[in-house]
Amino acid sequence: GRITRNSIHYLIIDGVETPVHLTEFAKDSVFAYQHSYLPDYVTEKTKGLIPSEKVEQFLLSDMRVGTLPRLMDLTGNQCVVVDGENQGDFDQFASDIITAASQGKRFLFRSAASILTSLAALGKQPIPAEEMAKYTRNGKPGVVIMGSYVKKSTQQLEQLLQAPGIVGIEVDVSHLLEESETQRQELLQQILDQIYAIHNAGQTPVIYTSRQELQFDTVEIRLAFGSKVSDLLMDIVRGLPPDIGFLISKGGITSNDVLSKGLSLKTARLLGQVLAGCSMVKTASNHPLYPNLPVVLFPGNVGDAKGLATVYQRLSQPQT
């Protein structure tokens, strides 16, 4: 999990609160950062446009007594960083936000999902995480799409590939550097043929990109190549067997692309979390490709080594 205390953001790794700038995620080739102290992070990401001393801080002590007066005093698009250790902290904060908004205040959030849970005042999800196989369509095997290549994701992939009923399909993305459109289409068809064969055998294919991160001269070239990889993965999503039982998307960018591009969703029904930090949504009953399909959104930096295998096992449990 993650917490923010005294405006320092921590990732909890094996029970140890670790400032996020010390984790592998801070060294990302595109989204790197050097600060865990959020006012300094804001300055870094705005390239000095917002000085750290201008960033408002809502500490735990503020959150737990109420922040409404300070929210009402904010003006001129001030930036605020917010502490939080548990859902209760955000419940109180969300209540103050809603009250301030009802009095004319407007807020723009950059946040994780916890604040949405509080703003929507969601209670317990209707079906517990351990029983979410009830959403799996007709008890059919699913598909896992994995774009994230960070160390944590690779550890989770290794565990998943050992699970019964799982068959891996590695996509060597280096082929996308120079291949022609014809070669790309041949690669896509080869992958889809493997997926159908695995699915028809009653097993779950795991489509994952090669684990080696390629090096590029500029961030722009890196992003352009990332778009090529994403385009291939989304073509795979659109070409999956129509009767798959579920879809698990691993990686934050991959998950966003699966929803917005692969499935072309405008809206989705949120079913809850199948694992802490992993939301599950369902497509509409009239979706043109996959009606009522449960889709797991699994960020790259979430879960322990067994997290991905746990989600797969929860969705694959036989129903009586």
Regions found by a protein language model. Give the residues of each.
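Cap/lid and interdomain-hinge subdomains that line or gate substrate/regulatory clefts
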Residues: 1-90, 318-320
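Active-site histidine-anchored catalytic micro-motif
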Residues: 1-36, 244-252, 256-305, 310
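Short acidic, glycine/serine/threonine-rich loops at helix termini
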Residues: 3-13, 92-96, 120-124, 156-157, ...
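General beta-strand structural signal in soluble alpha/beta enzymes
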Residues: 50-56, 80-84, 107-112, 117, ...
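Solvent-exposed alpha-helices and their adjacent loops that cap or buttress functional pockets
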Residues: 71-75, 98-103, 133-138, 197-200, ...
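Residue-level preference for the first positions of well-ordered beta-strands
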Residues: 77-81, 106-108, 141-143, 202-206, ...
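Acidic, glycine-rich loop-and-beta core segments that form the ion-binding/anion-interacting portion
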Residues: 100-171
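C-terminal structural cap/anchor segments
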Residues: 188-252
